């Protein structure tokens, strides 16, 4: 006896994927360009910290902008450090130093410890 067809799970709140196709006049389907964002990751972290709290799309836009800004600052500083030391590769050491230079006091300490933890987890999983 065949099993009843299962419906696709409802998309999670906060994950916005541009997979819808725009209809052209001549009947051809055209894929919409994907807009990359950190929204799904921000949402996952929010649920880890405050499981019963939601986030508005405006607040998500602000968070996405914040993550992009911090990413660019850290990448730029790490690039400068690599250039000063005549290195062509940005390693975790450059990233760590860039974080120490950019973030104030206790925030830098926490960021470095979380980053070290993430790198350790990644290398042990390989």
Swiss-Prot record:
Residues joined by cross-link Glycyl lysine isopeptide (Lys-Gly) (interchain with G-Cter in ubiquitin): 35, 121
InterPro entries: Histone-fold (IPR009072), Histone_H2A/H2B/H3 (IPR007125), Histone_H2B (IPR000558), HISTONE_H2B_site (IPR055333)
Protein name, as recorded: Histone H2B type 1-J
Assembly notes: The nucleosome is a histone octamer containing two molecules each of H2A, H2B, H3 and H4 assembled in one H3-H4 heterotetramer and two H2A-H2B heterodimers. The octamer wraps approximately 147 bp of DNA. Heterodimer H2BC11 and H2AZ1 interacts with VPS72 (via N-terminal domain).
Post-translational modification: Monoubiquitination at Lys-35 (H2BK34Ub) by the MSL1/MSL2 dimer is required for histone H3 'Lys-4' (H3K4me) and 'Lys-79' (H3K79me) methylation and transcription activation at specific gene loci, such as HOXA9 and MEIS1 loci. Similarly, monoubiquitination at Lys-121 (H2BK120Ub) by the RNF20/40 complex gives a specific tag for epigenetic transcriptional activation and is also prerequisite for histone H3 'Lys-4' and 'Lys-79' methylation. It also functions cooperatively with the FACT dimer to stimulate elongation by RNA polymerase II. Phosphorylation at Ser-37 (H2BS36ph) by AMPK in response to stress promotes transcription. Phosphorylated on Ser-15 (H2BS14ph) by STK4/MST1 during apoptosis; which facilitates apoptotic chromatin condensation. Also phosphorylated on Ser-15 in response to DNA double strand breaks (DSBs), and in correlation with somatic hypermutation and immunoglobulin class-switch recombination.
Molecular function GO terms recorded: DNA binding; lipopolysaccharide binding; protein heterodimerization activity; structural constituent of chromatin
Low complexity: bias regions: 1-12
Stretches for region Disordered: 1-35
Family matches, as SMART domains: H2B (SM00427)
Location of ADP-ribosylserine modifications: 7
Keyword Acetylation listed: yes
Modified residues (Omega-N-methylarginine): 87, 93
Modification N-acetylproline occurs at: 2
Record PTM N6-(2-hydroxyisobutyryl)lysine, positions in chain: 6, 13, 21, 24-25, 35, 44, 47, 58, 86, 109, 117, 121
Residues bearing the modification N6,N6,N6-trimethyllysine: 86
Subcellular location: Nucleus; Chromosome
PTM annotation (ADP-ribosyl glutamic acid): residues: 3
Name of the gene this protein is made from: H2BC11
Modified residues (N6-(beta-hydroxybutyryl)lysine): 6, 12, 17, 21, 35, 86, 117, 121
């Amino acid at each position: 006896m065949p099993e009843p067809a299962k419906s696709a799970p409802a998309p999670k709140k906060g994950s916005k994927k541009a997979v819808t196709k725009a209809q052209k006049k001549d009947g051809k389907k055209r894929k919409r360009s994907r807009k990359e964002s950190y929204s799904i990751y921000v949402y996952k972290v929010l649920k880890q910290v405050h499981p019963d709290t939601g986030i508005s799309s405006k607040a998500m836009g602000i968070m996405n902008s914040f993550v992009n800004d911090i990413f660019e600052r850290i990448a730029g500083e790490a690039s400068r450090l690599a250039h000063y030391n005549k290195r062509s590769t940005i390693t975790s050491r450059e990233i760590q130093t860039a974080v120490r230079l950019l973030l104030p006091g206790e925030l830098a300490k926490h960021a470095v410890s979380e980053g070290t933890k993430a790198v350790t987890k990644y290398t042990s999983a390989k």
